[in-house]
Amino acid sequence: MIFVLDVGNTNAVLGVFEEGELRQHWRMETDRHKTEDEYGMLVKQLLEHEGLSFEDVKGIIVSSVVPPIMFALERMCEKYFKIKPLVVGPGIKTGLNIKYENPREVGADRIVNAVAGIHLYGSPLIIVDFGTATTYCYINEEKHYMGGVITPGIMISAEALYSRAAKLPRIEITKPSSVVGKNTVSAMQSGILYGYVGQVEGIVKRMKEEAKQEPKVIATGGLAKLISEESNVIDVVDPFLTLKGLYMLYERNANLQHEKGE
């Protein structure tokens, strides 16, 4: 069984794969202040709830866009699983040809999504990930990672309205009953939702025009389903794209080590 861990700025998503299938997954808040023991006890409870233990896990891979948390997570893996985790970063074999000016600038989550997207959906491809930041990644027909777009995430936009405008409340991100809001909350919900739908459609349109291609558009992340229901440019919603990519990277690197006799 392989344990995969994707750490984002707001949430961390964990999963266990068994024989290539995602057996279970969990989501928890990213906490930069937790120790390896606190993470260890939390993961222990999650595993035990599914009738699993640390000993059932034979390999671990971690992707993180939050560097301060990595020390605690690596220590947790070594202390409780007795396994040194594979970390997505320099040295890992992705098979991805990255055409960024500085490939090291590409976030681990974007690399993982690209690996999974190419394997599952082919190319050319646009991957939209609705996280703390919303990222758009373009993979061309030759399966090269060409770059992308980064915008403030949906929740950041909503929080900015709440924190910077004294009379505007904090809202739930959901579809309002109409585009024209009849009260402050519904007006804000409409602005956030349909403003983002417009952003997605506009950016995807421009990316396609610049690439002179008609790539398939894959959406992932917490609010991908909500946005896709209001947009006509998203072809597939895959909520577990990143976890699948992590598993694929683990298998690729484990097989390479096996071939080398390591």
Curated annotation (Swiss-Prot):
The protein's required cofactors: NH4(+); K(+)
Main enzyme class: transferase
Residues reported in the UniProt entry to bind ATP: D6, V7, G8, N9, T10, N11, A12, V13, T132
Alphabetical keyword list: ATP-binding, Coenzyme A biosynthesis, Cytoplasm, Kinase, Metal-binding, Nucleotide-binding, Potassium, Transferase
Cofactor comment: A monovalent cation. Ammonium or potassium.
A single GO cellular-component term on record: cytoplasm
The reaction(s) this protein catalyses: (R)-pantothenate + ATP = (R)-4'-phosphopantothenate + ADP + H(+)
Pathway in which the depicted protein is active: Cofactor biosynthesis; coenzyme A biosynthesis; CoA from (R)-pantothenate: step 1/5
Binding site for K(+): D129
Subcellular localization(s) per the UniProt record: Cytoplasm
Keyword ATP-binding appears in the UniProt entry: yes
EC number, as in UniProt: 2.7.1.33
GO MF assignments: ATP binding; metal ion binding; pantothenate kinase activity
Active site: D109 (proton acceptor)
Main location: cytoplasm
Entry binding sites for substrate: Y100, G107, A108, D109, R110, T184
UniProt subunit comment: Homodimer.
Function in brief: Catalyzes the phosphorylation of pantothenate (Pan), the first step in CoA biosynthesis.
Family, as annotated: Belongs to the type III pantothenate kinase family.
Name under which the protein is recorded: Type III pantothenate kinase
Organism: Bacillus anthracis
Lineage: Bacteria, Bacillati, Bacillota, Bacilli, Bacillales
